[in-house]
Amino acid sequence: MSVYGLQRLYIAGAHADATSGKTFDTFDPATGELLARVQQASADDVDRAVASAREGQREWAAMTAMQRSRILRRAVELLRERNNALAELEMRDTGKPIAETRAVDIVTGADVIEYYAGLATAIEGLQVPLRPESFVYTRREPLGVCAGIGAWNYPIQIACWKSAPALAAGNAMIFKPSEVTPLSALKLAEIYTEAGVPAGVFNVVQGDGSVGALLSAHPGIAKVSFTGGVETGKKVMSLAGASSLKEVTMELGGKSPLIVFDDADLDRAADIAVTANFFSAGQVCTNGTRVFVQQAVKDAFVERVLARVARIRAGKPSDPDTNFGPLASAAQLDKVLGYIDSGKAEGAKLLAGGARLVNDHFASGQYVAPTVFGDCRDDMRIVREEIFGPVMSILSFETEDEAIARANATDYGLAAGVVTENLSRAHRAIHRLEAGICWINTWGESPAEMPVGGYKQSGVGRENGITTLEHYTRIKSVQVELGRYQPVF
């Protein structure tokens, strides 16, 4: 018997049975308990979702921007009213501590919907005079039906981040959550419907990567926004382009550098480094997992980091005092433990953690101790590859130029940060770092107003911020001639 029973698709404003005959299970990563059996969408179900999205989108786009704004604001109110219940669901599905899901996951998703609800009325075109009797004007029109494909680390937040600009601009969205954390997107769909979003404007189809491939290749979809790993992102982008030259937004992986200079406030730097590696058990795409520390302060910095790691409270996610939970799946647990073994084998110095937590209530969950490696080299796998778990690699450097060169020596370019009291150095270093999201003397906050996205193989396009709306609209140019037409022949 599962906790939440059978979960279906959400199409045309209501829960709907899948036609594939297939299901998959989702488990509580802290206890191993079966949470739900989930129906997997078929190709026919995706077609049905696209058809209902087209119909709903026409009604949604015909509304005034102010009407759409009011409906989205009502959805925000409902999300905030139900924050605690949604946070508990997210806690069970992801394994995150309840203190975290209550304060972050739903809150930041609602903030982004509120932000774009406020911008819906600001979508406008231009008027360009050509001659006294002729001018051009432009219209920003919605793309139509968009697809969102989410990751398992921030299920409801990602669903909000992808749907908010799409809906504000007059589009419909078909959202596929990760099969690892499939539950909260259905609650968001219910909230949108209750708020007044027309049937079909936000549909949810469940399933594994094969369902994501169906969405990416579907000719009736105009844009795909994907969050996940680099290799999967490349496949999604290839399918999207080969099928119908879709617009794409890709928020992919990272191996982000955090540079601590010798003039830094070391207590602050240690606080930042621990947050940048162990928040959400290290399952954050922007984590600063390559920690470069100037040689003169390395020992003092390491001492402070280890003191803070010792204070991390791993435990039951439902305990309000817990601030460190399990990994989201058994597959991720095996992957992270494999990287830890690799770090040991390649000669990194294990300073903390380095093993699975198995005592007492940890035995049935997917917990890995917060792990810190010192004396790391740039050629180690734990330094080069994205782990997506609670593993910090500390490296030393001598000069600013050296730190920048080594920080940039990666195929990734999602995030970067510096800790220094020297304002000139801070900006100089940030301007040289090849990353799309950067922080000075802080780490990790991604407010609605801040564009989020990467350089190099960390992504294409941006989420959040004003400019994202441009990527959910297309420009129509119209020339108007008020005077006599001048024939060519």
From Swiss-Prot:
Pathway: Amine and polyamine biosynthesis; betaine biosynthesis via choline pathway; betaine from betaine aldehyde: step 1/1. The keyword NAD applies. The keyword Magnesium does not apply. The modification Cysteine sulfenic acid (-SOH) is found at C285. K(+) 2 binds at L245, K456, G459. It catalyses: betaine aldehyde + NAD(+) + H2O = glycine betaine + NADH + 2 H(+). Keywords: Metal-binding, NAD, NADP, Oxidation, Oxidoreductase, Potassium. Involved in the biosynthesis of the osmoprotectant glycine betaine. Catalyzes the irreversible oxidation of betaine aldehyde to the corresponding acid. Signal peptide: none annotated. The active site is at K162, E251, C285, E463. The lineage of its organism: Bacteria, Pseudomonadati, Pseudomonadota, Betaproteobacteria, Burkholderiales. Its cofactor is K(+). Binds 2 potassium ions per subunit. CDD domains: ALDH_F9_TMBADH. The record marks E247 as: Seems to be a necessary countercharge to the potassium cations. K(+) 1 binds at T26, D93, V180. Dimer of dimers. Its EC number is 1.2.1.8. Coiled coil: none annotated. One of its GO terms (biological process) is glycine betaine biosynthetic process from choline. SUPFAM superfamilies: ALDH-like (SSF53720). NAD(+) binds at G150, A151, W152, K176, P177, S178, E179, G229, V230, E231, T232, G253, C285, E386. One of its GO terms (molecular function) is betaine-aldehyde dehydrogenase (NAD+) activity. It comes from the Bacteria. Belongs to the aldehyde dehydrogenase family. This is Betaine aldehyde dehydrogenase.
